[in-house]
Each structure stands twice: as C-alpha cells, then as structure tokens.
Amino acid sequence: MVAYDEFPIPTADTFSLTGGDAQVYEAAVSIFNRKDCPEYFSEGSSDLILPMLVQYGKYQTDEGNTTYVVNFARCFFFDLGNGLGDMQNPVYTSTCLNNLASITLGKDGALVAFTEAKDGTDDGEFSRFAHEICGPMTDLAEEITAAGGILPEGEHQVPNVNSYEAMVQQYLDYFFEG
C-alpha cells in the first residue's frame, strides 16, 4: 500500500511541461498539495489528489503580470495506493472538484495571486466573481456566467492529457516506473 503522504507531490517535469504551462502548473501545485491543504486528506488513506487546469484565457495586468483564467480542478483518485498491483492497470475510483479561478504569475513566473469563485453563491454574486476573475475579458465572464460557472472546453488543458486516467498513469509512470 502507498499511503497518501507517500505519494510524491507532482512538478511540471512529472507531465513534461515547459514554459508558461510549467509555471502555471507549478503555481497550481503550490496552491493545492497535501502539505498545504491537509483538510482534503485523511490519515491512513491511500488517495492521490492532483491539480489540473483548463485554461480559458489569459491577460496582462497593469503591473505586467500574467493572469490565467482557469477551471481549477482538484482530481481525487480514491484508494489508488491499494490498487497498484499492476502499475499499468491501477485500480481506483475518481472524481474532480471544479471551480473558476485566476492564477496570476509575476514576470519571473512566481505566484503573485490566486482568486477562486466562492462555492454556494447566488447567480448575482457568481457573476460578480466571474467578472473579477476574468478581469478585462468581459465576454469570457459573460460566457462563464451563462454556462453556470464551468465551460465544457477551454483553450487548452494543463497537463495536456486526454483523460484523468491518462493523467494518473503519467504520474505513476514518472514516479514509480522510472
């Protein structure tokens, strides 16, 4: 069994990310990982949780920083640590929590700010959050508000995998097969 605290925290290298994708993924991991968000993990579990982003757009701030507007997904792979008898066919159940967010990186690529829409808000309040998160991209804010918070597709996904299964397999191959 691999316990939740024995799964390595992913890096951009885990998914062969480079450039802006690497920077925004490293920021996502710094926001959401088992050390900084222990409330998502339970003692004795064998769960893995990975962040994933669907980028809807990006813009430059007045300060010259880059803000990424994303669907910030927290992907849960339940009981994975007990299902690793065959690394190429791991056994687990999964789900993802999705939320509209913005991640702002400085000119050096370091995390400057993270803003996430609040859960349980009414339509008017969500619209305000969407406009705050989207900044000057008002058409995107309107589209997100009309869709109820999450768009089915974005510009691209980070890491760029075609499924949650592919993401967890790439993670396992990187940390456990090498």
Regions found by a protein language model. Give the residues of each.
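N-terminal export/targeting and maturation segments
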Residues: 1-74
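Intrinsic disorder/low-structure terminal segments
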Residues: 6, 14, 113, 174-175
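Proline-rich intrinsically disordered, low-complexity coils
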Residues: 8-10, 38, 51, 90, ...
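Solvent-exposed, acidic/flexible segments
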Residues: 17-25, 94, 98, 123, ...
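Residue-identity detector for glutamine
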Residues: 23, 55, 60, 88, ...
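Mature extracytoplasmic domains of secretory-pathway proteins
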Residues: 48-124
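C-terminal partner/receptor-binding element of secreted or periplasmic proteins
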Residues: 121-178
